[in-house]
């Protein structure tokens, strides 16, 4: 999976900065390899990385801890789902950067969304669509940073809106009541505690029209580009 010379080079470093995304980078494989070789690295360990990367596994860990998350089911390639409440969100189980994520409003869009998600992996997550505002909360050494609101100018916070400069309005601190912000920070910290995430991470959340908070996922290697969220917090 990795060229030997890359690992040899990493062994010589005092600390390896983890700037990887997607499979092998965020799912704990690199972290586990580094642990076996005694290589120090930034970010959380292999187990919490694996839990956070898998949306299916994360739900199994976070929901029993009382953390509010959208209802959803896991669907494997070739299997059918009997009932789908529209609109719904379809996403690859272990994807990142919103790649392969779609919102389906009817059966036709749902089938198209499944085809798109299954083109990336064999397991997808089908979740209820929460109509609300999007937020993100960074957690540094167990302590939540200020809440940031994400307002895409078009559509939802997909891959294009995440990485194309000027496509999304981001407000930090978010223009929300202090008690709501405190709740979001609490749930972000709770997510990281439950999944065993240390050092730093970013938790994505939604706020519906009734001020109900929903936690979406934990990003253990959040983006650090000019358009990324954590540098703004």
List PLM regions with ranges:
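ATP-binding N-terminal substructure of ATP-dependent carboxylate-amine bond-forming enzymes
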Residues: 1-47, 51-53, 57, 64, ...
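Conserved metal-phosphate-binding beta-hairpin within the catalytic cores
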Residues: 128, 139, 192-224
């Amino acid at each position: 999976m990795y060229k030997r010379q890359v690992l040899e080079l990493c062994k010589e470093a005092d600390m390896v900065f983890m700037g990887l995304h997607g499979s092998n980078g965020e799912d704990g494989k690199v972290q586990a390899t580094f642990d076996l070789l005694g290589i120090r690295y930034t970010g959380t360990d292999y187990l919490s990385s694996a839990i956070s990367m898998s949306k299916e596994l994360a739900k199994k860990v976070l929901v029993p801890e009382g953390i509010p998350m959208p209802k959803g089911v896991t669907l494997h390639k070739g299997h059918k789902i009997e009932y789908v409440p529209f609109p719904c969100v379809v996403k690859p189980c272990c994807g990142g950067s919103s790649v392969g994520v779609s919102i389906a409003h009817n059966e036709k869009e749902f089938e198209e969304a499944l085809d798109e998600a299954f083109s990336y992996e064999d397991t997808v997550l089908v979740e209820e669509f929460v109509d609300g505002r999007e937020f993100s909360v960074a957690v540094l050494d167990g302590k939540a940073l200020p809440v940031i609101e994400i307002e895409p100018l078009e559509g939802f916070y997909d891959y294009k809106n995440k990485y194309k400069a000027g496509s999304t309005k981001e407000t930090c601190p978010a223009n929300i009541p202090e008690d709501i912000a405190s709740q979001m920070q609490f749930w972000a910290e709770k997510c990281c505690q439950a999944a065993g995430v240390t050092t730093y991470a970013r938790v994505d959340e939604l706020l519906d029209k009734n001020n109900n908070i929903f936690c979406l996922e934990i990003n253990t290697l959040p983006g650090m580009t000019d358009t990324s969220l954590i540098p703004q917090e």
